[in-house]
C-alpha cells in the first residue's frame, strides 16, 4: 500500500495523533478553519450555489472520488462534473474538525441549505495539497441526518 493512501486512511480514521498533529475539535459547534482550508469550503459552496459543475469538479484531484449516499462511487473530474451537473441550490458548510499533516488533511463537518439553520447532514472531505500549495479534494462523502424520500 503506498504511503499516501496509508496516510489518508489514518487521517480519515481519526488517528492523526499518531501522525503527530491532533485534530482540532469543538464540542460547542463549528470551528474556525485555517484560511487555506476555509477556501475549500467557500469555493465548494459558491460552485454548488451557482450550479457550476465544471468549477466544482476542479476542486477535486484528477482522480478524486465522490461517495454519494445510496449511489455508486464516482471517480475522476469528468465523472464528478457529470454527477454535479444541474441547477444550483443553496448550501452552507461548516466544519467540526480538521487536520493537516504535510500534504494530506481532512475536514469533517455538517451541511444545511442556509447558514444558521440546523444541519441536514454530515460530510467528510479528504484533502491533498497539490504542487502549487492548493488543497484539493481527494474524496467527498456525505450523508443525510434523515432518510430522504
For the regions a protein language model found, what residue spans apply to each?
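A short gly/proline-enriched turn/hairpin at secondary-structure junctions
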Residues: 59, 63-74, 86-87
